[in-house]
Structure formats: structure tokens, C-alpha cells
Amino acid sequence: MGNCNEYTALKIGALLHDIGKFIQRASDKPKSKGHDKFGYEFLKEKFKNGFLNHLDEKTKDKILEIVKEHHNQKIKDDLIGIVRLADWLSSGERREPKGDPENVEVLNTEEQKLLSIFETVCIGELTENLYKNGFKYSLKPLNVSDAIFTDKPYPNENYKELFSKFEDEIKDFKGDVSFEELYQLMQKYTWCIPSVTMWKKAGSLKGGLPDVSLFDHSKTTCAIACCLYQMYVKENKKKNKYAKEYIDDKTLEKLFNNDNGWNKEIFSLIHGDLSGIQDFVFTITTKYATKSLKGRSFYLDFLTEYFAKYICKELNLPITNILFYGGGHFYILSYKVDENLINKLEKEINEVLFNMFRTKIYITIAEVGVTPNDFKKSEDKESKEKTWGFAKKWKEVSEKTVEKKLRRFEYKLEGLFEPYNRGSENRCVICRNEFDKNEKGYAIRENESKSERICDYCASFVALTDILKNFQMEKTIKFNKAYPIIHLTKNKDNLSLQREEFSFLTVKAIEKLESKFRVLSDENYFLKEYKLPHDSGELIIPYKIWAIAFPIIENETEKRILDFDGLAEKAFERTGTRKIGILKMDVDNLGEIFTTGLGNDATISRMSTLSSMLTLFFTGYIPHLIKNEEFEVNGKKYKFKDNIYLVYAGGDDTLIVGAWDAVWELAKRIRGDFKKFVCYNPYITLSAGIVFVNPKFEFKKAVNMAEEELENGKNYIIYEDEETEKKVDKNALTVFNCPMNWDLEVEYNEYCWTKLKSYLEGINKEMVELESLVKKFNEDDLEKNLKKQLKRQIRKESYI
């Protein structure tokens, strides 16, 4: 965790500042004292028993002081003042919250459950009945299976059972425990605990309804506190050279007294956007697609995490300050930095990427200033503005990145037009790029007697794919462990030679990054080993939730990933049709959900909760589903894991390849589970596009076809009332250029119809008639028709 110093105490103290809320709710006498005292006494005892015993006594004392005094209104300076202010800002307040006893709802301990954040998205005015009837999470340690789903207004689990598991695990937190492990301990056990349990019956108090987890509140409090500390100046404390603004004890006091400073930009919200993803991942020959496809898609997702952590490293901020990463984007909360620094970091990263991949990959980084007022919830109920608070800044920095992206490579325009290729026919068989003059490349084995030559970077992605396969089988990530890569050798003429060995750190595409940025070697940002989620979905600290799911076949000599021909053959054995399916899915209107969906309660902690939950579904649950669930064809069950190749899942979307019938069944399963995951909220929907092709069909073209099908679904409008401006659109499955609304045309879901009608008041006669038609609709009939249509399509397009 680094040297035991004031900054270490601040990070840990801020992360654990509200741990007493957990202990209090598990106590037999929860009203005997405040949560701050519960937390103080708990940590004091644990420190005596060896918890975090690598810290010195002064650091432990400072942590205890922060936990005990962070609500002390008399203390407005130093670390306690910083954490106290961060606590306010995380909650969207600018004062210590106080409730009118006659107008405040306070839950009994056994009733204090976390309302799903999805229950509050796009619903307008919060209501008292929303908490009463809304779905809440069970009190279970975080996993990637059942814990993240809820369909219960009143889960039965109690705090004592959860706290007992927490205490058992904390016994292992002795020795040199990393900050990331402590962060994961909080995530695992406090993700399902509400950070507040009281609110005004009319209006809101400290964040409105209890839909923000204690983990996300603690994470964002820590992030804000670290920003404030990096700006904080006092005697014997060295100034941060990157901070554009500075604060001292007088500044803190003025902020607490609401004197001034609330409109001063002392924070930055930084957004990174990786370009070129589609072309980079899919511009490969189909022949070796399965050998390098996952390595390529994983690499780009890894770059998003890697560069977010690199920026945090440069700014001396912990991982808590990464508010979101996935899908080629990241958002970081920072102290106010100069735009020239952002441009410098952007140029520095792009120089390395350009030297590796020329213009194929580019990162755009932008920042906007954030004031303390921007953390506040809006108190203007009459405002016509659709975007409030922190969501407004989220939207602003995203738009700035889009505008900046139009000027990419402007710093080196001359270099772009310099001669690069030599016109040689000596090219890599995977990416079709010329070999560099002195590049020897690698031989990739096609079969036991034949091989072809590939470039060093394609060899990296072949190696990464195989390394990820080994991670999946071992359920452990070991960055230093070397694996023999069964397809690769340096000698093209002797295929019997021992295969090349690579570790995650020694593949060229990773090695080049590390030689410049040194992020993987910094324990503040990456550990040497992680556990992948267990088959049960359990998360074992330290864990890494990476979306890995390969169809693996095993013979006497090797375990290899099934290729597209093998996947098509599996479908042929079941259906008589030798095709693969390509599925693209993503969340509809995600930008609007983030920028307007939370209304005037769009606090930083609420947005953190929303983003982390969506990431859990795509990055955690979808791989778990593929590796553990089955589908049925003609009365016989088959495993998804033997039929599905997960190319990508993260952020808000997924790309999947597999046996065509398995892909069809998986699309329905993912969508059904997603609907349950978001508590059947009709404003949070998922669209999908599927294509069925020959396994040797050009892969990039097939992906583009799936993308077109997805877009057809997103443009699909099944019902629109121009007078009321209400419509039912998107939320569609598209196949054979035919979009179908999931709820209205693919299957009848009574609960969804009931909820839909409750949102669309004054529903007209046509919608009522449509519901009756959908009730009579049978999905089995649809599948039969689709299979007939598929056979006609195959005959029509037999050239594929």
C-alpha cells in the first residue's frame, strides 16, 4: 500500500468513514450510539487484533480519528474537515443533513434494505410508495450470479448473517494488505447496504430514497477527499505541481459556512474515449479469427482500464477516482488540472499507440471544470432543464470529447503523410499488414504439417487469447506466469520445435506499454495475481471481473478453443443447419439514462451506483451465464459454454459468436435476465441484432451486418402518439432485417404490460387491442417461422 503516511490515512479513513453503519445494523442495540462511534470501536478492536498491521500506530490513530469525528461540526480543518466535506459532496448536500422528526421516514433496522437504483430511473417525482413496493437487494456478499438480481419488495436476509461473513473475511486482512484489497472488501460486503435510511416524505433528504449503496457512497467520498487533499496546502506539506487550484483550512471553513467558493471550479471531470475499436478488432482473416479475436477485443478493453489507471498514477489519485471504465470509455474525478496537462497526457499516450499501430487506435481525453455546487442535487423543481448536477458535467465532458475527437492527430499531421509501407507482398496472414523491415514475426500453425507467418503484434493477440484461455481454466490471473502457446513458434520450417512461451507481461503489445507507463508494476493500480469469479459466482479477494468465456475442447495433447467450423458443426448436429450466429446487444438510450434518467437527484454516488451495476451485469453476469447455464433443443439440453465464444462484454454492450441455435437461445436468455436485473423498468431496455452466416464468411462483414440489424432495432417504433409525444420504440430483437419488440411481439410478459400501462397514462384503444393480440402470440410459432425463413434465406444466399 506504500509508505504509511497522512495520505494513506486519508484514503483508508475516507473509504471506511461510514463502516459503523454496517456494524450498527448488525448490532443487538443499534440505537445505543451513533454509527461513527460504532465504526470507531470496531476498527480500534480490529487494529489491536492485527487488522492492517503493516500500518504504523500514528496512521492507525489518524484513521480512527477520521471515522470517529467525521460528523463533528466543530472540526472544519485538516483531514477530518476534508473527509467531512467530501461526505457532503458525495451525498449531494451543502450542509449537515437534519430531518424534521414529524416529516421524516426512518426505517427499522431489519427493514433497512437497498432499493435498486433502476427503480428510480426516469420515473419523475419520487414517491413514498416507491420504496414500499420497489424491489430491494438481499443482504448477500457480492457475486456475479444471483445476488445482483432482485424481485422482492421485502428480502428476508438479516444484517447479522452478512456481518458474520464480513468478520470472518477481515481476519485475513493482516500483513501488507493493498488498498485495492481493502476496496474490494468494502465492495463485496457493503454493495447491498443503503448509505442512508431516512428521507423526507415530501421531497428528499440526503439523497432521497435509499438507492445508493454504502460502497458507492464510500468510494466517491474517498475519491472527493483525495482530490481535496491533493489541493490542500499547510505547513510542511509539499504543493502538488499539477493542481491548478489550492485550498487551506480557511478555504475549508468558508465552504462549511457556505460563505463562498461553492461556484469555483476546484475539481475536474476527465473523460477518455478510445477510437478505432471496430476496425482494430475485426479487420482480421476469418481463418485464424478464434485464435486472436478475443486477444484483440480484450486488449482494447484492457487499454481503457490501463490508461485510466495511468492518469490516476500521474495525478497521484487512487482507483476510487475512476468513476467508470468500459466500452472504450473512462471517467475520472480529479482535482482541477490545466487543460495543457490533459493534452500532454493525450499526446504521450497516442505517441506510443501510433508507434505500435499507426492510426488504427487513438485516444481522446478531455476535461471540464467542476464546482462544489455541481455535486449538489437540484432544488429547483420547476426547472425545465433536463440535466442536473453531476450528470450535467458528465454530459458536458462527453460532448467536449466528441468535438475534440474531430481533430485527432492534429499535433503530428506531417508525420501522417510520411511514407510508411514499402509495397511489399510480405504480409501478415491475419491483419494483412506488411512486415517491418527487420521483423521476423512468428509461424502460426494451421495444422500438424503447415504454418504461415504472422507479425509480432498479431502473435501478441494469439498469445493473449491463449493466456486468457488458461486464466479461464485455472480461474486465476497470474501476470508473471508463462504459458506455452500451442499455435506459435519462431521457426516456420520446423513445427515440431517447442512452442513459444509468453506471460501476460511479455507479449509485445503489453511489454511496449509497460516500458513507457509502468502501471502493471505499480501495486497501487494492479496486483500480481487475481482470482476470476468462481463457477458459483463467488468473488474471492483479490478478484478481477474480466469477461472471459471460451468453448474449449480437449484431446490427449492439448486444450484448444473451438473454431467457427467446430461451432457450426455443433449446430448442424442438432438442427441440420451448419451456420454460426453473431449477436450484438446493447442498452438503449444509455446516454440519456446517465444524463437525464436520475433527474435532479443525479449525485456522483448515485451515478457511481448506476454505472457499477450495469458493469456487473455485462462484465460479470453474462460470462457467468455462458459458463454455467444450459439451453434446450428438441427436448435435449446442451451447455452454452460448449457452443459460445464471448468476444466482448462490458460497459453496456456485448458481442457473441457461436453455434447459431445456441446464440438464438442465449439472446433470449440475456434479454430476459436483463429485464429482471433492471426491475422491469420499461425505460431501461436492451436491443439486439443477430445474423446467421457460413463459418467461413468474412468475419468483419458479418459483424457489420449484425451491427446493422442492431441499428434497425434501435430505429424501430411500434407505437407513437404525436399529440402526447409518447411512443414505444427500440427494445427490439432484429433478425433477417425484421425488428420485433421484445415485450409486444416476441413474447407476452404480463408484469411488463402492467408496468408499461402504469407509466403510459391514458393508454389508447389500439394499445389495449395490441395487448390482446400479443397474449395469443406464441414464441414457439415465431421460432418455427424463423427456422423456415432461415432455410429460405440459406437457399437464397447459398453463395455465402
UniProtKB/Swiss-Prot annotation:
What cofactor requirement does the entry state?
a divalent metal cation
Domain GGDEF: from-to ranges: 578-722
Alphabetical keyword list: Antiviral defense, ATP-binding, Endonuclease, Exonuclease, Hydrolase, Nuclease, Nucleotide-binding, RNA-binding, Transferase
**GO BP field:** defense response to virus
**Domain named HD: which ranges?**
1-92
Q: Is Amino-acid biosynthesis included in the keywords of this UniProt record?
A: no
| Entry EC no(s) | 3.1.-.-, 2.7.7.-
Asked whether the keyword 4Fe-4S is assigned, the reply is no
Q: The organism sits in which domain of life?
A: Archaea
In the record, what terms sit under GO molecular function? ATP binding; endonuclease activity; exonuclease activity; RNA binding; transferase activity
Entry similarity comment? Belongs to the CRISPR-associated Cas10/Csm1 family.
What else is on record for this protein? Encoded in a type III-A CRISPR locus.
* Swiss-Prot/TrEMBL domain comment: The N-terminal HD domain has ssDNase activity. The C-terminal GGDEF domain has the cOA synthesis activity.
Self-association or partners: how does it assemble?
A: Part of the Csm effector complex, that includes Cas10/Csm1, Csm2, Csm3, Csm4, Csm5 and mature crRNA. Stable Cas10/Csm1-Csm4 and Cas10-Csm1-Csm3-Csm4 subcomplexes can be isolated; Cas10 and Csm3 probably do not directly interact.
What this chain does, per the entry, is described as: CRISPR (clustered regularly interspaced short palindromic repeat) is an adaptive immune system that provides protection against mobile genetic elements (viruses, transposable elements and conjugative plasmids). CRISPR clusters contain spacers, sequences complementary to antecedent mobile elements, and target invading nucleic acids. CRISPR clusters are transcribed and processed into CRISPR RNA (crRNA). This subunit is a single-strand-specific deoxyribonuclease (ssDNase) which digests both linear and circular ssDNA; it has both exo- and endonuclease activity.
* UniProt name for this protein: CRISPR system single-strand-specific deoxyribonuclease Cas10/Csm1 (subtype III-A)
Q: Write down the species.
A: Methanocaldococcus jannaschii (strain ATCC 43067 / DSM 2661 / JAL-1 / JCM 10045 / NBRC 100440) (Methanococcus jannaschii)
Q: What is the lineage of its organism?
A: Archaea, Methanobacteriati, Methanobacteriota, Methanomada group, Methanococci
Q: What is the gene name?
A: cas10
